[in-house]
Regions:
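Phosphate- and other anionic-substrate recognition elements at nucleic-acid/protein interfaces
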Residues: 1-166
C-alpha cells in the first residue's frame, strides 16, 4: 500500500515575512524568512515540492492589502510581494487559498492590538510556544501560525465529514 501524505505551505507574503512547511508524513514543520533574491526563493520552493514527493500540496497565503493610511510606495510593495509569491506558485502549478489576518489570528485568540510591533511580539510568543524546536523570529512567526492554522482547519474538516458523535 502506498504511503500518502500532504505538505502544507503557509505563507506570510510581506517583505519581512516567511514560508512555513508542514510535512504531514514526519509531523514536522520548518520555516524560512522571505529572501530578496526571487530566483533563490523560487529554487527553495521547487526543492520543497520536488524533494518531498507529497501526494497533495496545500498552499495558504495571508490575504494582504494596503490601507488608506499607507504611503504609495508601501501599498505598491504589498502588491509586488504578493505578486511575486503568486508568480512562484504558478510556475510550479500550485493553487492557493487566502486567509485574512483576522481569521487566522482569531484562531489563536489574539486580542486586538493596534500597535503592529506589539502584535507581532504577541504572535511570536504564541509560535515559540507551539514550535519549541524552531528558532522563531518575527520574520517567520506568522508563516508558522498560518501553516498550523491550515493544518488544524483541515483536521476539523476531515472529522466533520466523518461525523462526530455528540
Amino acid at each position: 500500500m502506498k504511503d500518502t501524505y500532504k505538505l502544507i505551505l503557509g505563507i506570510d507574503p510581506g517583505k519581512g515575512g516567511g514560508l512555513a512547511v508542514y510535512n504531514e508524513k514526519e509531523n514536522e514543520t520548518k520555516a524560512i524568512k522571505f529572501m530578496d533574491d526571487l530566483c533563490e526563493l523560487s529554487a527553495v520552493v521547487g526543492s520543497i515540492i520536488h524533494g518531498f514527493k507529497a501526494d497533495e500540496i496545500y498552499v495558504i497565503i495571508e490575504h494582504v492589502h494596503s490601507f488608506p493610511t499607507d504611503s504609495r510606495p508601501s501599498a505598491f510593495s504589498f502588491g509586488r510581494n504578493l505578486g511575486q509569491w503568486e508568480g512562484i506558485l504558478a510556475s510550479y502549478e500550485l493553487g492557493k487559498e487566502t486567509v485574512a489576518p483576522k481569521t487566522w489570528q482569531n484562531h489563536y485568540d489574539v486580542p486586538i492590538i493596534k500597535n503592529k510591533y506589539e502584535r507581532k511580539r504577541w504572535l511570536k510568543e504564541i509560535a515559540q510556544t507551539m514550535f519549541p524546536d524552531i528558532r522563531v523570529t518575527l520574520n517567520i512567526c506568522d508563516a508558522l501560525l498560518i501553516a498550523n492554522y491550515a493544518k488544524e482547519m483541515q483536521y476539523y474538516k476531515k472529522n466533520e465529514k466523518k461525523g462526530r458523535k455528540k
